[in-house]
């Protein structure tokens, strides 16, 4: 009996999951939403209205399924995905989950999320013993909440492609006010695609000081802290500035279901030396698109055809040379050959990617070729990031880490050595140089520094355990992006 019972339970669980769940057959139309126009609408709206579990302040990594979803939605609409039997059920379920969460963010940009949740509860209670058709649901939704679902769902089901959101100039300032600390998060965002997108700002709803006062310095370790959330639709081609008051010290900006990878920009308030502001205005504001253009600036990213890799003296590949080749990203940082990775601290739009490898003898190289069209003096920058892992202990910023750059053209050839552990993340200057019209190459070789066993890791987010302290520490070499900025004479 026990064996048969377990088999039955296992089969039951399988039949209740995925695109082909049999549970609706037993609802007797008590909580199932049906529509001939929008297939699987019940599953989509179930995800959208499950607002209680869609937001956290936890850090998430890019999963292989995220990349699969992006590649699929670049080529197919949701309606086409539903009828494409060549796609796995697992991928289609993942797409529906992300589409549902994205729909929730779109709706929350117009209607308070708590009102959305209460509306779904009222509908379920009101039609407890009746069939719920989507037409009736949409009619009540517009009557009670003032929003027409039809055009929104038409776009969800018919749109091919994803929004590409250029988020920049992220800034956190402390608001000058009495009481507990408050912070103003501001940033600019431009939608460089022809598909509408949505931005979500999320932050803790209380500072650590407030929580200590509420719980008398005995904050429960499993406390489910409340969050402050605001969603904004960023129309195709729009340029906006967003201002968001943070009541806590941590939060993030999410680009939701977009071509951006990773989809989140994490915010951690550093109180020491923070700038102050009296501005307490929050919302979304139109800005000039010229704010996103930088005259006299040339950037070559690792995703460019002007970027090349060399492993052990042999040219490797141009990463985007073969457009039809499937992109493969890895979260493995200790390879002896160049490996393409996605990290939240890399440069790139829409994919924040870079190449990394273990330090070698100088045979491995990353080469950026920049076409200078106007002669003059330029300042050359490279994009630097802190990247570490504990097993085995490798880091881009161990004490003693060095980066060996070479800047050259037909008349210039200069070497620059950078102490990687002593410079900040982001754009770091390699110096100013006079360039004539033509090609300039910036070359990074894989020589590192002399990393001792007692070297410290400047990336304070990583703690090396005692079992790993006996392993040799190795430097990571990271190749991301370079920038030339014309210097005004």
What are these regions (language model features)?
Residues 141-198, 203-206, 430:
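A terminal-accessory region detector
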Residues 174-257:
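Beta-strand-rich binding/interaction modules
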Residues 82-170:
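Amphipathic alpha-helical substructures
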Residues 90-95, 126-128, 174-177, 231-234, ...:
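Short, contiguous acidic/charged loop-to-helix segments that flank catalytic cores in large enzymes
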Residues 283-489:
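Extracytoplasmic
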Residues 247-284:
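Terminal connector regions
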Residues 1-77:
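Zinc-dependent metallopeptidase catalytic helix centered on the HExxH motif
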């Amino acid at each position: 009996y026990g064996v048969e019972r377990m088999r039955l339970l296992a089969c039951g669980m399988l039949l209740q999951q995925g695109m082909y769940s049999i549970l609706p057959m037993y609802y007797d139309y008590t909580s199932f939403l049906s529509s001939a126009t929008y297939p699987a609408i019940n599953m989509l709206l179930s995800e959208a209205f499950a607002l209680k579990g869609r937001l956290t302040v936890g850090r998430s990594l890019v999963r292989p399924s995220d990349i699969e979803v992006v590649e699929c939605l670049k080529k197919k609409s949701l309606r086409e995905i539903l009828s494409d039997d060549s796609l796995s059920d697992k991928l289609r379920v993942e797409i529906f989950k992300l589409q549902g969460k994205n729909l929730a963010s779109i709706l929350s940009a117009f209607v308070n999320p708590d009102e959305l949740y209460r509306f779904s509860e009222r509908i379920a209670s009101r039609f407890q013993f009746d069939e719920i058709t989507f037409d009736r649901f949409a009619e009540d939704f517009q009557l009670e909440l003032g929003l027409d679902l039809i055009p929104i769902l038409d776009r969800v089901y018919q749109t091919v492609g994803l929004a590409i959101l250029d988020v920049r100039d992220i800034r956190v300032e402390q608001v000058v006010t009495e009481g507990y600390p408050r912070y103003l998060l501001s940033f600019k965002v431009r939608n460089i695609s022809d598909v509408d997108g949505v931005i979500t700002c999320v932050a803790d709803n209380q500072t650590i000081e407030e929580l200590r006062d509420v719980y008398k310095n005995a904050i429960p370790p499993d406390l489910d802290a409340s969050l402050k959330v605001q969603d904004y639709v960023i129309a195709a081609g729009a340029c906006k500035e967003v201002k968001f008051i943070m009541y806590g010290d941590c939060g993030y900006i999410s680009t939701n279901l977009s071509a951006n990878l990773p989809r989140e920009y994490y915010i951690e308030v550093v109180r020491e030396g923070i700038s102050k502001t009296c501005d307490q205005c929050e919302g979304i504001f139109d800005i000039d698109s010229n704010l996103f253009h930088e005259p006299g600036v040339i950037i070559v990213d690792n995703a460019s055809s002007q970027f090349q890799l060399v492993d052990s003296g042999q040219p490797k590949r141009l990463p985007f040379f073969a457009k039809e080749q499937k992109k493969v990203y890895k979260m493995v940082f200790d390879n002896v050959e160049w490996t393409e990775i996605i990290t939240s601290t890399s440069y790139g739009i829409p994919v924040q990617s870079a190449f990394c490898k273990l330090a070698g003898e100088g045979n491995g190289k990353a080469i950026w070729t920049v076409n200078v069209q106007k002669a003059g003096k330029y300042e050359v920058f490279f994009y630097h990031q802190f990247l570490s892992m504990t097993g085995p202990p490798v880091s881009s910023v161990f004490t003693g880490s060095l980066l060996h750059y070479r800047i050259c053209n037909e008349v210039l050839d200069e070497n620059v050595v950078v102490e990687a552990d002593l410079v900040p993340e982001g754009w770091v200057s390699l110096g100013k140089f006079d360039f004539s019209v033509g090609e300039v190459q910036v070359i990074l070789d894989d020589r590192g520094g002399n990393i001792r066993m007692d070297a410290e890791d400047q990336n304070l987010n990583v703690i090396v355990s005692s079992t790993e302290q006996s392993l040799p520490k190795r430097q990571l070499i990271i190749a991301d992006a370079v920038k030339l900025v014309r210097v005004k004479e």
